[in-house]
Amino acid sequence: MSQEKQVFSIDLAGRQLTVETGQLAKQANGAVLVRYGDTAVLSTATASKEAKNVDFFPLTVNYEERLYAVGKIPGGFIKREGRPSEKAILASRLIDRPIRPLFADGFRNEVQVVSIVMSVDQDCSSEMAAMLGSSLALSISDIPFEGPIAGTTVGRINGEFVINPTVEQQEQSDIHLVVAGTKDAINMVEAGADQVPEETMLEAIMFGHDEIKRLIAFQEEIVQAVGKEKSEVKLYEVDADLNQAVREMAEKDMHSAIQVHEKHAREDAINEVKKRVIEHYEAQEADADTLGQVNEILYKIVKEEVRRLITVEKIRPDGRKGDEIRPLASEVGILSRTHGSGLFTRGQTQALSICTLGALGDVQILDGLGVEESKRFMHHYNFPSFSVGETRPMRGPGRREIGHGALGERALEPVIPSEKDFPYTVRLVSEVLESNGSTSQASICGSTLAMMDAGVPLKAPVAGIAMGLVKTGEHYTILSDIQGMEDHLGDMDFKVAGTAHGVTALQMDIKIDGLSREILEEALQQAKVGRVHILNHMLSVIAEPRTELSAYAPKIITMTINPDKIRDVIGPSGKQINKIIEETGVKIDIEQDGTVFISSINQEMNDKAKKIIEDIVREVQVGEIYEGKVKRVEKFGAFVELFSGKDGLVHISELALERVGKVEDVVKIGDVITVKVIEIDKQGRVNLSRKVLLKEEQEKEAAKEENKQEQQ
């Protein structure tokens, strides 16, 4: 590869995308700087010279955010980037998934792909720049990568598809799709949508693939110009004689074990065969490498037989038909003190989801590279080891948990009511209690049940289903509601979530080169049938959201004040608002447009806080009459509190009908008197009169007396 800087450009959605090679990170196997608008991402690919002694392909993909890219200094005491943000973890997974299938089976050299985001133009996706950069860094390197791949985002505005929509366009779009693939096929899909029909989603995917072909042609030109010759790497292979011997010893028994329908019984039967074969070779004092090869051969026997049964005999490991859903069971309200709970069970997969409602002040604050500063809807997914009957250390969420949580969040967000209609922060936590595949989709179903139990007025209930594929040559079988073994040994994990009206989320991962339009279309239609079946089951448990919130959920009242009065409610250094909070125990959130949200479990305290705020922002009008308490007495008059935070002056001459020598002769501190507003001066000072009201009363009495005399 030439070590001199070279620049290549292409127009992408009306903005220039530029690739620079030969200047930065020259010690990496491959490196490119991708500029898209003002976004700049440095992508590098590095590989170990020797294969690792592992039974898998050790690929690591990192998407690294730097806050200098948006002109920010990290918060906190240390003032440097810490652990990756959720967005960075999701971007790493997004890049990993289309790249991983394009390395040869048996390639065991460690590969690391790193993309550092150095500058961000919000209208030009840094994730898509990083995906293109990662593919190019691998393609121009000497690493044996069978790409390139490319990815693009697709939106839809007023029925028209848009490539790489800007921030403004994304707000108007009802589809948020990321699609990646090779020039021949699609191999990764990630999408959120606002209840969009399957046919439209398929059209959006194919629309994105047309752009992908153009980006791949662009990459091929760059590889032609600056690419290195690919290294000759010896791929891992098991010994042919050993392979034959193990197969003769284990195949028949393994085939019988695989056809045990119950998960744990099947695993025990398979492990018994493995144990017998391993013990045979241990007795012959086989070394660790040989035992490793034996394990790999046994794994291949299982994989081949499972795939043969599915594609040839149309038999699934648990005996179901291809489009059959496992038995369903659901329950709501099983946790008394939570705001809402839903238990969803599908075969041996079980998720318990809990809904918690909070004030708008409980929103999650986001400190990253995006334009979004906070979010009021969250879904978190936990996968403890006991869910699969194993033991392991309990640590924080990993990439998988974060990815599954984000998928559930994306699926449910389109049906969450607006802040105006439901002024709450909503947090969902899905605890996976049993796992045999499709746990992320079970968490979506459980979360829908939990929100309906909590009284969240969803636009429509959402269910999710995971579809699988086993493909051999031109023959393939699409599976509904895949279980763990089918996911592990199959070619596709295609998750589809949505309502009865359309799709709200898609996620597709595949282990083969790519999928055709026909297979995608069939999978989407089969998923729709399964999704509607699951929705009908859920609605038989709870038909609609509860009309009342839990007694333990906060009550929120909304009021609107003049935006100019916000400063009065807050007070200097927050003194006034903190006083209200301390006095009532409520939470208060104020929007810039003057909308005030008051929340507390105690409705009486909510009402009290509202009254205080109303008094603070109330405008005094000339001619209004108040009953107020005398707060202060001076020689020239008395100061009367009309309502909380607002005083007025009754001049000594306005205290009584007769001449007053001393204010104290008429009123003293603590007296409650009725006064009328007679003037508000240019400085906003309120002048009051008691005399005017006394005179009016005197005149009324005189008029009454006169009427009485006339009637006599």
Swiss-Prot record:
<dbReference type="InterPro" id="IPR027408">
    <property type="entry name" value="PNPase/RNase_PH_dom_sf"/>
</dbReference>
<dbReference type="Pfam" id="PF00013">
    <property type="entry name" value="KH_1"/>
</dbReference>
<dbReference type="InterPro" id="IPR036612">
    <property type="entry name" value="KH_dom_type_1_sf"/>
</dbReference>
<feature type="domain" description="S1 motif">
    <location>
        <begin position="623"/>
        <end position="691"/>
    </location>
</feature>
<keyword id="KW-0460">Magnesium</keyword>
<dbReference type="Pfam" id="PF03726">
    <property type="entry name" value="PNPase"/>
</dbReference>
<feature type="binding site">
    <location>
        <position position="487"/>
    </location>
    <ligand>
        <name>Mg(2+)</name>
    </ligand>
</feature>
<dbReference type="GO" id="GO:0000175">
    <property type="term" value="F:3'-5'-RNA exonuclease activity"/>
</dbReference>
<dbReference type="GO" id="GO:0000287">
    <property type="term" value="F:magnesium ion binding"/>
</dbReference>
<keyword id="KW-0548">Nucleotidyltransferase</keyword>
<feature type="domain" description="KH">
    <location>
        <begin position="554"/>
        <end position="613"/>
    </location>
</feature>
<dbReference type="InterPro" id="IPR012162">
    <property type="entry name" value="PNPase"/>
</dbReference>
<dbReference type="Pfam" id="PF01138">
    <property type="entry name" value="RNase_PH"/>
</dbReference>
<keyword id="KW-0808">Transferase</keyword>
<dbReference type="InterPro" id="IPR015847">
    <property type="entry name" value="ExoRNase_PH_dom2"/>
</dbReference>
<dbReference type="InterPro" id="IPR015848">
    <property type="entry name" value="PNPase_PH_RNA-bd_bac/org-type"/>
</dbReference>
<dbReference type="GO" id="GO:0005829">
    <property type="term" value="C:cytosol"/>
</dbReference>
<dbReference type="Pfam" id="PF03725">
    <property type="entry name" value="RNase_PH_C"/>
</dbReference>
<keyword id="KW-0963">Cytoplasm</keyword>
<feature type="binding site">
    <location>
        <position position="493"/>
    </location>
    <ligand>
        <name>Mg(2+)</name>
    </ligand>
</feature>
<dbReference type="InterPro" id="IPR001247">
    <property type="entry name" value="ExoRNase_PH_dom1"/>
</dbReference>
<keyword id="KW-0479">Metal-binding</keyword>
<dbReference type="GO" id="GO:0003723">
    <property type="term" value="F:RNA binding"/>
</dbReference>
<dbReference type="InterPro" id="IPR004088">
    <property type="entry name" value="KH_dom_type_1"/>
</dbReference>
<dbReference type="InterPro" id="IPR020568">
    <property type="entry name" value="Ribosomal_Su5_D2-typ_SF"/>
</dbReference>
<keyword id="KW-0694">RNA-binding</keyword>
<dbReference type="InterPro" id="IPR012340">
    <property type="entry name" value="NA-bd_OB-fold"/>
</dbReference>
<dbReference type="InterPro" id="IPR036345">
    <property type="entry name" value="ExoRNase_PH_dom2_sf"/>
</dbReference>
<dbReference type="GO" id="GO:0006402">
    <property type="term" value="P:mRNA catabolic process"/>
</dbReference>
<dbReference type="Pfam" id="PF00575">
    <property type="entry name" value="S1"/>
</dbReference>
<comment type="similarity">
    <text>Belongs to the polyribonucleotide nucleotidyltransferase family.</text>
</comment>
<dbReference type="GO" id="GO:0004654">
    <property type="term" value="F:polyribonucleotide nucleotidyltransferase activity"/>
</dbReference>
<dbReference type="GO" id="GO:0006396">
    <property type="term" value="P:RNA processing"/>
</dbReference>
<dbReference type="InterPro" id="IPR003029">
    <property type="entry name" value="S1_domain"/>
</dbReference>
<protein>
    <recommendedName>
        <fullName>Polyribonucleotide nucleotidyltransferase</fullName>
        <ecNumber>2.7.7.8</ecNumber>
    </recommendedName>
</protein>
<comment type="function">
    <text>Involved in mRNA degradation. Catalyzes the phosphorolysis of single-stranded polyribonucleotides processively in the 3'- to 5'-direction.</text>
</comment>
<dbReference type="InterPro" id="IPR004087">
    <property type="entry name" value="KH_dom"/>
</dbReference>
